[in-house]
Amino acid sequence: MVSSKDIIQRRARRVRRRIKMVSHDRPRLSVYRSNQNIYAQVIDDLRGCTLVSASTLESDLKKSLKSGADKEAAFAVGKLIAERAKKAGVNEVVFDRGAYVYHGRVKALAEAAREGGLSF
């Protein structure tokens, strides 16, 4: 019988493989979701460094949100990461959802980043 941990690992491997196939030297917008917060980073895999990041732990964002773990918070982080990425000169990224299903907070972050001007 396949455990849920195995299913999650397979999903993550499948997503990473597809990202490598379509990346074409574009930076990767990586999302990490915890029970309390949500984090986003734009990572340049060629240089091996993080270009910009945003999370609900940042003080200015934390003050304006009632919770760091809802869709509203994810939307705010998506807007912020798009703004910072555009300021750093990044317009096109590859969305890396990891093993998370494209639904709820992950989807809200992605849609906000698209509204903010990132294309993926």
Curated annotation (Swiss-Prot):
CDD domains: Ribosomal_L18_L5e. Transmembrane segments: none annotated. The keyword Ribosomal protein applies. InterPro entries: Ribosomal_uL18_bac-type (IPR004389), Ribosomal_uL18_bac/euk (IPR005484). GO terms for cellular component: cytosolic large ribosomal subunit. GO terms for molecular function: 5S rRNA binding; structural constituent of ribosome. Keywords: Ribonucleoprotein, Ribosomal protein, RNA-binding, rRNA-binding. It holds the Pfam family Ribosomal_L18p. One of its GO terms (biological process) is translation. This is one of the proteins that bind and probably mediate the attachment of the 5S RNA into the large ribosomal subunit, where it forms part of the central protuberance. Belongs to the universal ribosomal protein uL18 family. Part of the 50S ribosomal subunit; part of the 5S rRNA/L5/L18/L25 subcomplex. Contacts the 5S and 23S rRNAs. This is Large ribosomal subunit protein uL18.
